[in-house]
Amino acid sequence: MQLTPRSVHLVHLLLAATTLISPSWSNHQSQQPALQALSPDDTLFAHLRCFELFASGQQSRDRDADAADWLGGNRERYLHRVERTPAFVKCVLGRMHFYDSSERRFNVNILRTQYNAYKQWMTLSEEDVDDFIHEVSNIGALNSSNDAEVYDALKLLFTNHSVSFFQLFLRDPTVLQNMYDDKSLSVRKPNQTVVQFCELQMAAELWDDICLIRAYQISNHTEAMERHIACIFRGFQYLDANSSIDVKEIVRDYELTETLDEASKNSIEECARNASEKDDIPKRSLAMYSCLLDGSHSEVFKKAFDFREVRSGNLTFLVQNLPYDRDQVRQQILALDKEHCNDQQPLAGRFIED
């Protein structure tokens, strides 16, 4: 499908935001605290996933408008109300842990957590944050957690605190640019996939095995391989906020490639149970990855994994709601392979003909 000029602009806008993702925690090996700060990757993913769930389903101007309003980083347009907006807003607030539907309350703790983690890149003062927290606290419990009531509550907060909201949840372009300019942070570049980013972070001893790894083989440099796969799983959101295997997220990628059936779903669940016995996050990640590559369902996993890699560096798929095209994905994956591997290097097993 041809993109409209407006759609092309939106894709470029979104990819600019993607350059600012910094999963610097991707190799952490310890369990994370119960309420950890959200990274730019986390808050962007919350918006992208809720966009997928609630934007206009058609490849149309309505979908373009939803992308511009919800993903464009414009405070004045963010809460522009159409029938889909309240559901999107509640979805985002829940995924960012700012609203608890079961308690019917906003969570002020996440505001302080975000500020403490990222204040060096923000223009907010302690007083700004305290005022925001005070006003959020004064709201108390809502009468219900229906979409409209949550939306109305956030809109009221936006009257005085839209700048604070955008900065604390890392959707403000200035804050993101400040983070991008800080050379001490690792950031993902425009059109760079999660796998490409993680390849640049991986240990030197893995580089001799890069073609084998891209062909879904496991390097003998076990600890480095564990950290590499953990980085990818973080970026793909295959690990949840507690660093547990997110079965639903993996299942979803199988659904998008139309390869999910009862047997493959059972295989994913069994692999997750076994991998979860590993206390160490990198070991858990590699155990899950290895299990999914083992047995009769390995090829469907590769299809899902390849599509996830391509989509992570090309938001056209999301903005335009484009379906899975096996030949197109294969061509893009082979192009990525050739960045590291020539025709003489080992890529055997990369693809099995359908």
Curated annotation (Swiss-Prot):
Any single GO CC term annotated in Swiss-Prot or TrEMBL for this entry: extracellular region
Pfam family, one: PBP_GOBP
Keyword match Secreted: yes
SUPFAM superfamilies named in the record: Insect pheromone/odorant-binding proteins
Major localization class: secreted
One GO MF term: toxin activity
Residues in the signal sequence: 1-26
A GO BP entry: vasodilation
Keyword flag Electron transport: no
Key words of the record: Hemostasis impairing toxin, Platelet aggregation inhibiting toxin, Secreted, Signal, Toxin, Vasoactive, Vasodilator
Localization per Swiss-Prot or TrEMBL: Secreted
Coiled-coil region list: none
Stated family: Belongs to the PBP/GOBP family.
Chain's role: Modulates blood feeding of female mosquitoes on vertebrate species by binding and sequestering different mediators involved in the host response. Binds serotonin with high affinity. Binds weakly noradrenaline and histamine. Does not bind tryptamine, octopamine, dopamine, adrenaline, leukotriene C4, leukotriene D4, leukotriene B4, ADP and U-46619, a stable analog of thromboxane A2. Inhibits agonist-induced platelet aggregation. Exhibits vasodilating activity.
Name under which the protein is recorded: Long form salivary protein D7L3
Annotated organism of origin: Anopheles gambiae
Gene: 7DL3
